[in-house]
Protein backbone atom coordinates (compact mmCIF):
# COMPACT_ATOMS: atom_id res chain seq x y z
CA UNK A 1 0.00 0.00 0.00
CA UNK A 2 1.17 3.51 -0.76
CA UNK A 3 0.43 4.71 2.80
CA UNK A 4 -1.28 3.71 6.04
CA UNK A 5 -5.02 3.73 5.23
CA UNK A 6 -6.17 3.86 8.87
CA UNK A 7 -4.01 6.28 10.89
CA UNK A 8 -6.84 7.21 13.28
CA UNK A 9 -7.46 3.54 14.03
CA UNK A 10 -3.78 2.92 14.73
CA UNK A 11 -3.53 6.01 16.94
CA UNK A 12 -6.41 4.78 19.10
CA UNK A 13 -4.91 1.30 19.16
CA UNK A 14 -1.67 2.73 20.54
CA UNK A 15 -3.22 4.90 23.24
CA UNK A 16 -6.41 3.20 24.47
CA UNK A 17 -7.60 -0.28 25.40
CA UNK A 18 -7.64 -2.70 22.48
CA UNK A 19 -7.31 -6.35 21.59
CA UNK A 20 -8.36 -9.15 19.29
CA UNK A 21 -12.07 -9.94 19.14
CA UNK A 22 -13.18 -13.48 18.30
CA UNK A 23 -16.36 -13.23 16.22
CA UNK A 24 -18.76 -15.97 15.07
CA UNK A 25 -18.76 -15.18 11.33
CA UNK A 26 -16.54 -14.46 8.32
CA UNK A 27 -17.50 -12.60 5.15
CA UNK A 28 -21.11 -11.99 6.18
CA UNK A 29 -23.43 -12.36 9.15
CA UNK A 30 -23.00 -8.99 10.83
CA UNK A 31 -26.17 -9.53 12.86
CA UNK A 32 -24.71 -12.50 14.71
CA UNK A 33 -21.62 -10.64 15.91
CA UNK A 34 -23.97 -7.81 16.80
CA UNK A 35 -26.19 -10.17 18.77
CA UNK A 36 -23.23 -11.46 20.78
CA UNK A 37 -21.97 -7.97 21.57
CA UNK A 38 -25.35 -6.54 22.59
CA UNK A 39 -26.65 -9.52 24.60
CA UNK A 40 -23.50 -11.14 25.98
CA UNK A 41 -24.76 -14.46 24.59
CA UNK A 42 -22.71 -16.88 22.48
CA UNK A 43 -23.70 -18.04 18.99
CA UNK A 44 -22.09 -21.44 19.61
CA UNK A 45 -25.27 -22.49 21.44
CA UNK A 46 -27.53 -21.81 18.45
CA UNK A 47 -28.15 -23.89 15.33
CA UNK A 48 -25.73 -23.84 12.40
CA UNK A 49 -26.49 -20.87 10.17
CA UNK A 50 -29.11 -19.52 12.56
CA UNK A 51 -29.78 -15.81 12.95
CA UNK A 52 -31.39 -15.18 16.36
CA UNK A 53 -32.81 -11.90 15.04
CA UNK A 54 -34.88 -13.95 12.58
CA UNK A 55 -35.74 -16.87 14.87
CA UNK A 56 -36.05 -16.64 18.65
CA UNK A 57 -36.16 -12.83 18.78
CA UNK A 58 -39.13 -12.69 16.42
CA UNK A 59 -41.43 -13.30 19.39
CA UNK A 60 -39.22 -13.56 22.47
CA UNK A 61 -37.82 -10.55 24.30
CA UNK A 62 -34.17 -10.70 25.26
CA UNK A 63 -32.20 -8.92 27.95
CA UNK A 64 -29.41 -6.82 26.42
CA UNK A 65 -27.03 -4.01 27.22
CA UNK A 66 -29.85 -1.64 26.24
CA UNK A 67 -32.36 -3.01 28.75
CA UNK A 68 -29.68 -3.28 31.43
CA UNK A 69 -28.57 0.34 31.04
CA UNK A 70 -32.19 1.50 30.84
CA UNK A 71 -32.61 0.17 34.39
CA UNK A 72 -30.09 2.74 35.62
CA UNK A 73 -31.48 5.67 33.66
CA UNK A 74 -29.80 5.51 30.27
CA UNK A 75 -31.52 6.42 27.03
CA UNK A 76 -30.71 3.71 24.47
CA UNK A 77 -30.45 4.32 20.75
CA UNK A 78 -29.46 2.65 17.48
CA UNK A 79 -28.17 4.55 14.45
CA UNK A 80 -27.63 2.76 11.11
CA UNK A 81 -27.23 4.01 7.54
CA UNK A 82 -29.00 1.02 6.03
CA UNK A 83 -32.64 -0.03 5.92
CA UNK A 84 -34.38 -0.74 9.22
CA UNK A 85 -35.79 -4.11 8.15
CA UNK A 86 -32.45 -5.62 7.11
CA UNK A 87 -31.83 -8.64 9.39
CA UNK A 88 -35.24 -7.77 10.94
CA UNK A 89 -33.41 -5.22 13.08
CA UNK A 90 -36.53 -3.09 13.55
CA UNK A 91 -38.12 -5.95 15.47
CA UNK A 92 -34.95 -7.27 17.12
CA UNK A 93 -33.99 -3.93 18.64
CA UNK A 94 -37.46 -3.66 20.17
CA UNK A 95 -37.10 -7.16 21.62
CA UNK A 96 -33.75 -6.11 23.11
CA UNK A 97 -35.19 -3.04 24.79
CA UNK A 98 -33.88 -0.09 22.78
CA UNK A 99 -35.73 3.22 22.93
CA UNK A 100 -35.09 4.60 19.44
CA UNK A 101 -33.83 3.47 16.03
CA UNK A 102 -32.68 5.95 13.41
CA UNK A 103 -32.19 4.08 10.15
CA UNK A 104 -31.42 5.05 6.56
CA UNK A 105 -35.04 5.96 5.90
CA UNK A 106 -34.81 8.85 8.40
CA UNK A 107 -31.47 10.25 7.23
CA UNK A 108 -30.64 12.85 4.59
CA UNK A 109 -28.19 10.67 2.67
CA UNK A 110 -26.58 12.23 -0.39
CA UNK A 111 -23.25 10.41 -0.72
CA UNK A 112 -22.76 6.79 -1.78
CA UNK A 113 -19.78 4.53 -2.37
CA UNK A 114 -18.26 4.62 -5.89
CA UNK A 115 -20.06 1.46 -6.99
CA UNK A 116 -23.30 2.93 -5.62
CA UNK A 117 -24.33 0.10 -3.32
CA UNK A 118 -23.87 1.66 0.15
CA UNK A 119 -24.20 5.10 1.75
CA UNK A 120 -20.94 6.57 3.00
CA UNK A 121 -20.48 6.69 6.77
CA UNK A 122 -19.86 10.41 7.21
CA UNK A 123 -23.59 10.94 7.80
CA UNK A 124 -23.33 8.87 10.98
CA UNK A 125 -21.34 11.51 12.86
CA UNK A 126 -24.25 13.95 12.83
CA UNK A 127 -26.83 11.23 13.50
CA UNK A 128 -24.88 9.84 16.46
CA UNK A 129 -24.56 13.30 17.97
CA UNK A 130 -28.30 13.82 17.46
CA UNK A 131 -28.92 10.67 19.47
CA UNK A 132 -26.68 11.88 22.27
CA UNK A 133 -28.33 15.30 22.27
CA UNK A 134 -31.88 13.91 22.23
CA UNK A 135 -31.97 13.21 25.97
CA UNK A 136 -30.93 16.27 27.93
CA UNK A 137 -29.51 15.67 31.42
CA UNK A 138 -29.53 11.91 30.84
CA UNK A 139 -26.91 9.27 30.22
CA UNK A 140 -27.03 7.59 26.81
CA UNK A 141 -26.00 4.37 25.10
CA UNK A 142 -25.76 4.67 21.31
CA UNK A 143 -25.09 1.70 19.05
CA UNK A 144 -23.97 3.00 15.65
CA UNK A 145 -23.69 0.53 12.77
CA UNK A 146 -21.59 1.54 9.77
CA UNK A 147 -21.96 0.17 6.26
CA UNK A 148 -19.52 1.91 3.90
CA UNK A 149 -16.82 -0.75 4.15
CA UNK A 150 -19.18 -3.61 3.34
CA UNK A 151 -18.82 -5.79 0.24
CA UNK A 152 -19.15 -6.64 -2.53
CA UNK A 153 -15.77 -5.42 -3.72
CA UNK A 154 -15.65 -5.04 -7.52
CA UNK A 155 -13.12 -7.00 -9.55
CA UNK A 156 -13.11 -4.31 -12.23
CA UNK A 157 -11.22 -1.07 -11.65
CA UNK A 158 -13.68 1.45 -10.22
CA UNK A 159 -11.34 4.04 -8.71
CA UNK A 160 -9.49 6.14 -11.27
CA UNK A 161 -7.49 8.19 -8.76
CA UNK A 162 -7.46 6.30 -5.45
CA UNK A 163 -6.11 7.96 -2.31
CA UNK A 164 -4.36 4.69 -1.40
CA UNK A 165 -2.74 2.57 -4.10
CA UNK A 166 -2.47 -1.19 -3.63
CA UNK A 167 -0.18 -3.57 -5.50
CA UNK A 168 1.05 -7.13 -5.22
CA UNK A 169 -2.13 -9.20 -5.44
CA UNK A 170 -2.07 -12.45 -7.39
CA UNK A 171 -4.33 -11.14 -10.17
CA UNK A 172 -5.47 -7.80 -11.51
CA UNK A 173 -9.03 -8.59 -10.43
CA UNK A 174 -7.91 -9.33 -6.88
CA UNK A 175 -5.81 -6.16 -6.80
CA UNK A 176 -8.84 -4.13 -7.87
CA UNK A 177 -10.87 -5.65 -5.05
CA UNK A 178 -8.27 -4.92 -2.40
CA UNK A 179 -7.64 -1.39 -3.66
CA UNK A 180 -11.36 -0.63 -3.54
CA UNK A 181 -11.71 -2.16 -0.06
CA UNK A 182 -8.70 -0.30 1.32
CA UNK A 183 -9.94 3.04 0.01
CA UNK A 184 -13.40 2.54 1.45
CA UNK A 185 -12.02 1.79 4.89
CA UNK A 186 -9.68 4.75 4.53
CA UNK A 187 -12.83 6.88 4.38
CA UNK A 188 -14.25 5.00 7.37
CA UNK A 189 -11.06 5.89 9.22
CA UNK A 190 -11.83 9.55 8.49
CA UNK A 191 -15.25 8.93 10.02
CA UNK A 192 -13.56 7.54 13.14
CA UNK A 193 -11.53 10.71 13.56
CA UNK A 194 -14.54 12.94 12.96
CA UNK A 195 -16.70 10.98 15.41
CA UNK A 196 -14.11 11.18 18.19
CA UNK A 197 -13.72 14.91 17.61
CA UNK A 198 -17.50 15.43 17.69
CA UNK A 199 -18.17 13.50 20.90
CA UNK A 200 -15.14 14.98 22.65
CA UNK A 201 -16.38 18.46 21.81
CA UNK A 202 -19.63 17.78 23.70
CA UNK A 203 -17.74 17.81 27.01
CA UNK A 204 -19.47 14.77 28.55
CA UNK A 205 -17.74 11.75 30.05
CA UNK A 206 -17.70 9.36 27.11
CA UNK A 207 -16.43 5.92 26.16
CA UNK A 208 -16.35 4.94 22.48
CA UNK A 209 -15.95 1.28 21.53
CA UNK A 210 -15.38 0.22 17.92
CA UNK A 211 -15.11 -3.32 16.63
CA UNK A 212 -14.90 -5.24 13.40
CA UNK A 213 -17.91 -7.50 13.01
CA UNK A 214 -16.19 -9.82 10.52
CA UNK A 215 -13.39 -9.99 8.00
CA UNK A 216 -14.11 -9.97 4.28
CA UNK A 217 -13.59 -13.24 2.43
CA UNK A 218 -11.72 -12.54 -0.83
CA UNK A 219 -9.73 -15.75 -0.48
CA UNK A 220 -8.39 -15.12 3.02
CA UNK A 221 -7.17 -18.02 5.14
CA UNK A 222 -5.76 -18.31 8.65
CA UNK A 223 -2.20 -18.25 7.29
CA UNK A 224 -2.81 -14.79 5.79
CA UNK A 225 -3.66 -13.28 9.14
CA UNK A 226 -1.37 -11.73 11.72
CA UNK A 227 -3.63 -13.30 14.36
CA UNK A 228 -3.56 -16.68 12.61
CA UNK A 229 -7.37 -16.82 12.69
CA UNK A 230 -9.89 -15.45 10.19
CA UNK A 231 -12.47 -15.36 12.98
CA UNK A 232 -10.53 -12.66 14.82
CA UNK A 233 -10.96 -8.95 14.19
CA UNK A 234 -9.84 -6.08 16.43
CA UNK A 235 -11.67 -3.74 18.77
CA UNK A 236 -10.46 -0.29 19.72
CA UNK A 237 -11.66 2.23 22.29
CA UNK A 238 -11.44 5.89 23.22
CA UNK A 239 -12.43 7.75 26.36
CA UNK A 240 -12.07 11.20 27.88
CA UNK A 241 -12.35 9.91 31.46
CA UNK A 242 -8.73 8.98 32.10
CA UNK A 243 -9.39 5.23 32.08
CA UNK A 244 -6.16 3.19 31.99
CA UNK A 245 -5.15 1.29 28.87
CA UNK A 246 -6.01 -2.36 29.57
CA UNK A 247 -5.48 -4.53 26.50
CA UNK A 248 -7.26 -7.89 26.40
CA UNK A 249 -8.21 -10.42 23.75
CA UNK A 250 -11.93 -11.14 24.03
CA UNK A 251 -14.85 -12.86 22.38
CA UNK A 252 -17.60 -10.67 20.98
CA UNK A 253 -19.95 -11.77 23.77
CA UNK A 254 -17.42 -10.64 26.40
CA UNK A 255 -16.69 -7.22 24.92
CA UNK A 256 -19.23 -5.01 26.68
CA UNK A 257 -18.85 -6.77 30.03
CA UNK A 258 -15.17 -5.80 29.87
CA UNK A 259 -15.97 -2.19 28.96
CA UNK A 260 -18.71 -1.73 31.55
CA UNK A 261 -16.52 -3.32 34.21
CA UNK A 262 -13.81 -0.75 33.49
CA UNK A 263 -16.45 1.97 33.74
CA UNK A 264 -17.70 0.68 37.11
CA UNK A 265 -21.02 -0.58 35.73
CA UNK A 266 -22.09 -4.01 36.97
CA UNK A 267 -25.62 -4.38 35.65
CA UNK A 268 -27.41 -7.19 33.89
CA UNK A 269 -27.64 -10.95 34.10
CA UNK A 270 -25.29 -11.85 31.26
CA UNK A 271 -22.79 -9.04 31.68
CA UNK A 272 -22.49 -9.58 35.43
CA UNK A 273 -21.99 -13.29 34.75
CA UNK A 274 -19.07 -12.56 32.41
CA UNK A 275 -17.57 -10.08 34.86
CA UNK A 276 -17.61 -12.52 37.77
CA UNK A 277 -17.29 -15.97 36.17
CA UNK A 278 -15.06 -15.55 33.11
CA UNK A 279 -12.11 -17.27 34.77
CA UNK A 280 -14.08 -20.07 36.45
CA UNK A 281 -13.82 -23.72 35.35
CA UNK A 282 -17.59 -23.94 34.81
CA UNK A 283 -17.80 -20.66 32.85
CA UNK A 284 -18.88 -22.02 29.45
CA UNK A 285 -21.23 -24.65 30.88
CA UNK A 286 -22.88 -22.02 33.03
CA UNK A 287 -23.11 -19.67 30.06
CA UNK A 288 -24.92 -22.28 27.98
CA UNK A 289 -27.38 -23.05 30.79
CA UNK A 290 -28.02 -19.38 31.48
CA UNK A 291 -28.71 -18.62 27.81
CA UNK A 292 -31.11 -21.55 27.55
CA UNK A 293 -33.02 -20.45 30.64
CA UNK A 294 -33.41 -16.87 29.42
CA UNK A 295 -34.37 -17.66 25.82
CA UNK A 296 -36.02 -21.09 25.83
CA UNK A 297 -36.52 -22.15 29.43
CA UNK A 298 -38.80 -21.09 32.26
CA UNK A 299 -36.64 -18.12 33.23
CA UNK A 300 -35.79 -19.35 36.68
CA UNK A 301 -33.12 -16.64 36.68
CA UNK A 302 -35.94 -14.07 36.70
CA UNK A 303 -38.12 -16.11 39.11
CA UNK A 304 -40.35 -16.84 36.13
CA UNK A 305 -41.14 -13.18 35.47
CA UNK A 306 -40.70 -11.14 32.30
CA UNK A 307 -38.30 -8.52 33.63
CA UNK A 308 -37.18 -7.13 30.28
CA UNK A 309 -40.22 -6.78 27.99
CA UNK A 310 -39.96 -5.48 24.44
CA UNK A 311 -40.08 -1.73 24.03
CA UNK A 312 -42.21 0.44 21.81
CA UNK A 313 -39.27 1.21 19.54
CA UNK A 314 -39.52 4.72 18.15
CA UNK A 315 -38.29 5.68 14.71
CA UNK A 316 -37.84 9.20 15.99
CA UNK A 317 -36.13 10.95 18.87
CA UNK A 318 -38.06 11.26 22.08
CA UNK A 319 -37.00 13.42 25.02
CA UNK A 320 -36.56 11.76 28.41
CA UNK A 321 -35.25 13.50 31.51
CA UNK A 322 -33.59 12.03 34.57
CA UNK A 323 -31.82 13.90 37.38
CA UNK A 324 -28.51 12.08 36.97
CA UNK A 325 -25.08 13.08 35.78
CA UNK A 326 -24.57 12.48 32.08
CA UNK A 327 -22.19 9.77 31.01
CA UNK A 328 -22.12 8.37 27.53
CA UNK A 329 -21.22 5.00 26.07
CA UNK A 330 -21.07 4.87 22.30
CA UNK A 331 -20.50 1.58 20.50
CA UNK A 332 -19.72 1.59 16.81
CA UNK A 333 -19.70 -1.56 14.70
CA UNK A 334 -17.15 -1.04 11.97
CA UNK A 335 -17.69 -3.18 8.91
CA UNK A 336 -13.99 -3.62 8.22
CA UNK A 337 -10.75 -4.70 9.76
CA UNK A 338 -7.60 -3.43 8.10
CA UNK A 339 -5.28 -4.57 10.87
CA UNK A 340 -5.67 -8.10 9.60
CA UNK A 341 -5.28 -7.64 5.89
CA UNK A 342 -3.07 -10.26 4.24
CA UNK A 343 0.62 -9.68 4.79
CA UNK A 344 1.03 -8.47 1.22
CA UNK A 345 -1.43 -5.67 1.90
CA UNK A 346 0.21 -4.61 5.16
CA UNK A 347 3.47 -3.72 3.44
CA UNK A 348 3.65 0.06 3.10
Language model regions located:
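Solvent-exposed soluble domains appended to multi-pass membrane proteins
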Residues: 1-346
